[in-house]
Amino acid sequence: MGRGAGREYSPAATTAENGGGKKKQKEKELDELKKEVAMDDHKLSLDELGRKYQVDLSKGLTNQRAQDILARDGPNALTPPPTTPEWVKFCRQLFGGFSILLWIGALLCFLAYGILAAMEDEPSNDNLYLGIVLAAVVIVTGCFSYYQEAKSSKIMDSFKNMVPQQALVIREGEKMQINAEEVVVGDLVEVKGGDRVPADLRIISSHGCKVDNSSLTGESEPQTRSPEFTHENPLETRNICFFSTNCVEGTARGIVIATGDRTVMGRIATLASGLEVGQTPIAMEIEHFIQLITGVAVFLGVSFFVLSLILGYSWLEAVIFLIGIIVANVPEGLLATVTVCLTLTAKRMARKNCLVKNLEAVETLGSTSTICSDKTGTLTQNRMTVAHMWFDNQIHEADTTEDQSGATFDKRSPTWTALSRIAGLCNRAVFKAGQENISVSKRDTAGDASESALLKCIELSCGSVRKMRDRNPKVAEIPFNSTNKYQLSIHEREDSPQSHVLVMKGAPERILDRCSTILVQGKEIPLDKEMQDAFQNAYMELGGLGERVLGFCQLNLPSGKFPRGFKFDTDELNFPTEKLCFVGLMSMIDPPRAAVPDAVGKCRSAGIKVIMVTGDHPITAKAIAKGVGIISEGNETVEDIAARLNIPVSQVNPREAKACVVHGSDLKDMTSEQLDEILRDHTEIVFARTSPQQKLIIVEGCQRQGAIVAVTGDGVNDSPALKKADIGIAMGISGSDVSKQAADMILLDDNFASIVTGVEEGRLIFDNLKKSIAYTLTSNIPEITPFLLFIIANIPLPLGTVTILCIDLGTDMVPAISLAYEAAESDIMKRQPRNSQTDKLVNERLISMAYGQIGMIQALGGFFTYFVILAENGFLPSRLLGIRLDWDDRTTNDLEDSYGQEWTYEQRKVVEFTCHTAFFASIVVVQWADLIICKTRRNSVFQQGMKNKILIFGLLEETALAAFLSYCPGMGVALRMYPLKVTWWFCAFPYSLLIFIYDEVRKLILRRYPGGWVEKETYY
């Protein structure tokens, strides 16, 4: 909103030209909103204003006229952003992403059951059960995800202010309190310190009125408001107050010139809610994964469909096989696993003060490669603090730490006594009542930020300011105004022969002009050229640190001329304001938060670029950027190089400067190519004096570079950028409702350092999801191969559908989820951000490891157990080939085994179901080893250790569940699972050990020969 966003700029969105009229219309509106505010009410004289809005500037509107306008324009409120209806959100959870795969599986199962029912008198119910279970899984998981997100949005709703705002209007000459929603254009409104401005106002009269525009323009200093037209730009002029900003002090009257969505604030909110938001990285990953799995499933299904036709099966049977293979490829439990893993991480992050609004944002933060951070309140403490003083011709450092543990200075000098007295007396800030037990730095004050900083500084170093003011009562005052740039007050002295002292503070150069002497070590000496140079050097040094500098002076008024009780006249000045005595300078800054420099350092080592985007002054922005390490030591901007070499800036090659400070007014005239060049060529960037539209353009610029962008902000002005970013991060304490609504994540403690924790959690969950998926997919092979051999070799079915479900939704679930708790293998904050093009959640190497290597060993273990049991019962492997048709024939009750014994149909089926149970138990045994090897992707399990208690519980839980399913009475009827001999459990042990040894050797080669053939082929 501030200083012009590039008018020639058109957002990336506009490339989709063919989207029909509606889309074009919307894009046109968004482009309009990206431009600056156009209004001319600030240029009108009061008479013209009254005529334009048909209002009496002293009595206000009539009640009838106000009613008519309200009926015409509607209430003075922002249209809430279009929210997604709850049923749509629920359907997204039910039919989005991974769920589609399971729904297709369920439909195919019902189709297969239908075909069988048409063909046979007594069809097997397996497919029916499977279809029902698949549908149930999707519905339960969908409800769970929906509940999680609904819970987060409930927390969001609680942020909304429950109190209806009131406004003081004057109608028909009467003052009345009404609901702010009933304010109309043309209303005469009065605001005072502490009020929220109810609409956009044109000021017609004011008394010392200051407003806090920080949520709109990012300027942390309160801005003076008066009836004069001072600037062409409506956002800069003094005679306009904006809707939803706060009046800090003083009073003002104004005419309402815009309400609701037509206000400047309303425009920003509309801009934010109209932006298109892209897919999250994890959603893209899951889409890619579904394509891979579907590809594998369809390839296998079609291959065996063709093969079974060649082998002479009827086409109906072949279709049943096709469906069976596709369904067997669907990892039923994975959807639930991913959801639970993300939820667990979201809960962990909430404990560390990051509230994640939607689960997918958890991982987005981990892939972030650029953070565009606001300055005020995120990188800094959001409280002005006295940083330095200059008196007795030297600079003293004050304590700016959050817990007052920093530097101290010598307070014995009589000059400091005088300086502290002026700072305490020439000061209108006061502590709010009832805070005696709170430490001074944490107390709330009434008054502007700079005065509050002085008040706290003096209270900390000299004791009670209230007592000081009681001893020196104020008898006259000229408040600060923009023309003379000083504040002056006169106090009676109780502790001195002089009856009055005049104290003054203001812009240092203005104060110095009024002085003829200077106080050094308590003595007044003439203000000569040498002292003026010393002042100039100190002023430049403190200003160069990005600090706000104030000058202080005093004059002891002679008692003869000004006796006690003298009437001072502040309009027709009857006292001197020249030839004063200069005492010193004090400078203030909003200091960096303690944890930020460390957090910025961590981002740098994690390969994340931190860009500062602020509405503040370039010098201040650069000073804070250097203070927190966004511009690191030794890195120079073009201006720094020019100053060092003593040459004009135009002669410096911009590529030599690693750091860069861009002014909003320069950004306004840049083409998108020039912006891209800055973002590409400089590693450390600060944007100062930017408007909200420019913030949005910077985010879009970073995204054009292929970066995954996180944006932090607290003001309403940040909401378009928050919405556009891959992940928007709002501030929980200082943030406005609009910014929280637009963000994906909320920092409950407003601390930049919490973002770094979030990045770490996000990277960890991506690694752990990989492990979880690798673990889950591996058991697909021992589940599919029995079915394939059943088709090709015509053997009795080694593993039934129901037992597959017991693995996917029973024994595998807890172990897969337990991998979410696995600690990081190495320092994940020391590596570069993930490249979303190359580093996928599931890649071909993961599939080849899970399916082609570990899965195959598992299948061997299962078949070994299967053949052992059938051989013990008399069916040697050679007898089993081609036996399937007789085996499954209900009428054959005299089937001979290898030793000539005859078996009835029922007896055969009991042996077959016992094989199913044993195959299932074997998969559980080999999955033990799979779980342990999935703990790490590169390290040895012995380096990682078994510290993950949930994982140990998972191992015990899957074993206990398998034993329960095998030995519990009644399982033979319910799930057709039969008790096993103890020895049968041990058949798969050698295979389990083989998996463990095979993988440990592979990881050893990975560590010995990084980048070698083994890594290229098997490191996922």
Swiss-Prot record:
The modification Phosphothreonine is found at T570. Residues 80-82 are annotated as: Interaction with phosphoinositide-3 kinase. It is an enzyme of class 7 (translocase). It catalyses: K(+)(out) + Na(+)(in) + ATP + H2O = K(+)(in) + Na(+)(out) + ADP + phosphate + H(+). Residues 1-5 form a propeptide. InterPro entries: ATPase_P-typ_cation-transptr_C, ATPase_P-typ_cation-transptr_N, ATPase_P-typ_cyto_dom_N, ATPase_P-typ_P_site, ATPase_P-typ_TM_dom_sf, ATPase_P-typ_transduc_dom_A_sf, Cation_transp_ATPase_P-type, HAD-like_sf. One of its GO terms (biological process) is fear response. Mg(2+) binds at D714, D718. Residues 212-227 have a biased composition (Polar residues). Residues 1-31, 212-231 are annotated as: Disordered. It is a multi-pass membrane protein. It is found in: Membrane; Cell membrane. The keyword Phosphoprotein applies. The active site is at D374 (4-aspartylphosphate intermediate). It holds the Pfam family Cation_ATPase_N. GO terms for cellular component: caveola; cell projection; cell surface; cytoplasm; dendritic spine; endoplasmic reticulum; endosome; intercalated disc. Residues 6-85, 151-286, 337-769, 821-840, 936-948, 1004-1020 are cytoplasmic. The chain crosses the membrane at residues 86-106, 130-150, 287-306, 319-336, 770-789, 800-820, 841-863, 916-935, 949-967, 983-1003. Residues 107-129, 307-318, 790-799, 864-915, 968-982 are extracellular. Keywords: ATP-binding, Cell membrane, Ion transport, Magnesium, Membrane, Metal-binding, Nucleotide-binding, Phosphoprotein, Potassium, Potassium transport, Sodium, Sodium transport, Sodium/potassium transport, Translocase, Transmembrane, Transmembrane helix, Transport. GO terms for molecular function: ATP binding; ATP hydrolysis activity; ATPase-coupled monoatomic cation transmembrane transporter activity; P-type sodium:potassium-exchanging transporter activity; potassium ion binding; protein heterodimerization activity; protein-folding chaperone binding; sodium ion binding. The sodium/potassium-transporting ATPase is composed of a catalytic alpha subunit, an auxiliary non-catalytic beta subunit and an additional regulatory subunit. Interacts with regulatory subunit FXYD1. Belongs to the cation transport ATPase (P-type) (TC 3.A.3) family. Type IIC subfamily. This is the catalytic component of the active enzyme, which catalyzes the hydrolysis of ATP coupled with the exchange of sodium and potassium ions across the plasma membrane. This action creates the electrochemical gradient of sodium and potassium ions, providing the energy for active transport of various nutrients. This is Sodium/potassium-transporting ATPase subunit alpha-2. It comes from Rattus norvegicus. The lineage of its organism: Eukaryota, Metazoa, Chordata, Craniata, Vertebrata.
